């Protein structure tokens, strides 16, 4: 059994977790998350400099709490891991420097983890997670991607958003409707009282230079603009804006786009397992629609546990355990952080000469 202490500080959650595995069974001993939502809500979104300062303030307490809850001393940990890319650079540095300092202080091996690989690994804490190749829909505030994971756990991105990620669109529409930040939970809550078929909002596509459209890619900027124009027309007509109906219609269209393109991609690549992870994966409309539509195509859906959909250190620990178990990977202590790094470049984090 390997025990990993993992740190996640890529955006606005400060998280430390202790995880372990015995064979194919992964266990969470502690997963402490300190959210900064209240600090950023007044600004309508995450302020990078403020987020980094809050990580500095919160991380010592969160680390102590994680060790205490797991009933373990840091000397008993086998590996230490932290998110190193992609994310807000100042925030990533706080977690990375802390992790590498602990490694040097306690003579522990270090693993730098790709944030998206962490989200993909959150499914390892679910029962009967897929052991063979599968398609992952990663849908969060910063990313909307379709990633194929093969039998050897190699990763290939098959689809992506060309502008706003789905979670980003939720946040922007939430602000537009006066629902505050973060928009996802607020829209989902008020949409329960609305008619999802009230407004016919667009399902935007990306044109293919060869003709037609890119089958697996996403665009949510146009949908956001359509909601803005709808609200403007209603206001100009002197009518009351039906916020629940708009929220429900918006939520439905986002879910339909995600589900339709995910299932199309899975069918085309002959993948009969679909994994859904990331913050937006907590949306109940999306979860129900994905299961319902996939079942019609004999595709099995694996959903990330609700408490592991948003950013957390347990998923980073799971990614580290997976790297140790199947790849025997470790990172150089000189490895830095990067604001951008594609999922296909994740293996570079374990090269003798760090990429950054």
UniProtKB/Swiss-Prot annotation:
Q: Which residues bind Fe cation?
A: 115, 119, 311
What Gene Ontology terms for biological process does this UniProt record contain? tRNA threonylcarbamoyladenosine modification
Catalytic activities: L-threonylcarbamoyladenylate + adenosine(37) in tRNA = N(6)-L-threonylcarbamoyladenosine(37) in tRNA + AMP + H(+)
Residues that, per the record, bind substrate? 138-142, 171, 184, 283
Entry GO MF terms: iron ion binding; N(6)-L-threonylcarbamoyladenine synthase activity
Q: Which Pfam families match?
A: TsaD
Where it sits in the cell: the answer is: Cytoplasm
Q: Which domain of life is it from?
A: Bacteria
Signal peptide feature range: none
The record's remark on the cofactor is: Binds 1 Fe(2+) ion per subunit.
- Keywords recorded for this protein, A-Z: Acyltransferase, Cytoplasm, Iron, Metal-binding, Transferase, tRNA processing
Q: What class of enzyme is it?
A: transferase
Q: What Gene Ontology cellular component terms go with this record? A: cytoplasm
Keyword Nucleus belongs to the record: no
Q: What is its EC number?
A: 2.3.1.234
> Where is this chain primarily localised?
cytoplasm
Q: What does the record give as cofactor? A: Fe(2+)
Matches recorded under InterPro entries: ATPase_NBD, Gcp-like_dom, KAE1/TsaD, TsaD
Q: Which family does it belong to?
A: Belongs to the KAE1 / TsaD family.
In UniProt terms, what function does this protein have?
Answer: Required for the formation of a threonylcarbamoyl group on adenosine at position 37 (t(6)A37) in tRNAs that read codons beginning with adenine. Is involved in the transfer of the threonylcarbamoyl moiety of threonylcarbamoyl-AMP (TC-AMP) to the N6 group of A37, together with TsaE and TsaB. TsaD likely plays a direct catalytic role in this reaction.
What name does UniProt use for this protein? tRNA N6-adenosine threonylcarbamoyltransferase
Instruction: State the organism's lineage.
Output: Bacteria, Bacillati, Cyanobacteriota, Cyanophyceae, Synechococcales
């Amino acid at each position: 059994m390997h025990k990993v202490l993992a740190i996640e500080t890529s955006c606005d959650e400060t998280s430390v977790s202790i995880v372990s595995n015995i064979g194919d069974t992964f266990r969470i001993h502690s997963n402490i998350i300190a959210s900064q939502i209240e600090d950023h809500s007044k600004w309508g979104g995450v302020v990078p400099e403020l987020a980094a300062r809050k990580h500095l303030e919160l991380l010592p307490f969160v680390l102590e709490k994680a060790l205490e809850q797991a009933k373990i001393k840091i000397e008993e940990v086998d590996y230490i891991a932290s998110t190193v890319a992609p994310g807000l650079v100042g925030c990533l540095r706080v977690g990375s420097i802390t992790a590498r300092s602990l490694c040097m202080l306690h003579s522990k091996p270090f693993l730098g983890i790709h944030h998206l690989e962490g989200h993909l690994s959150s499914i390892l804490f679910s029962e009967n997670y897929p052991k063979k190749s599968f398609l992952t829909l990663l849908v969060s505030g910063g990313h909307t991607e379709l990633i194929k994971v093969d039998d050897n756990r190699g990763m290939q991105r098959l689809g992506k958003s060309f502008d706003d990620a789905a979670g980003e669109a939720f946040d922007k529409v939430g602000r537009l409707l006066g629902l505050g930040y973060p928009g996802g939970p607020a829209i989902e809550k008020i949409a329960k009282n609305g008619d999802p078929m009230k407004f016919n909002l667009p399902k935007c596509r990306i044109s293919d230079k060869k003709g037609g459209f890119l089958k697996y890619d996403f665009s949510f900027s146009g949908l956001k603009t359509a909601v803005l124009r709808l609200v403007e027309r209603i206001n100009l007509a002197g009518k009351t804006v039906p916020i629940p109906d708009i929220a429900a219609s918006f939520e439905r269209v986002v879910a339909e786009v995600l589900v339709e393109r995910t299932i199309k991609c899975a069918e085309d690549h002959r993948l009969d397992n679909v994994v859904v992870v990331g913050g937006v994966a907590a949306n109940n409309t999306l979860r129900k629609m994905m299961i319902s539509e996939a079942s019609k195509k004999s595709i099995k859906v694996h959903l990330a546990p609700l408490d592991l959909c948003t950013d957390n250190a347990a998923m980073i620990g799971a990614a580290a355990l997976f790297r140790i178990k199947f790849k025997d990977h470790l990172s150089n202590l000189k490895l830095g952080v990067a604001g951008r790094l594609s999922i296909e470049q994740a293996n570079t984090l374990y090269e003798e000469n760090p990429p950054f």
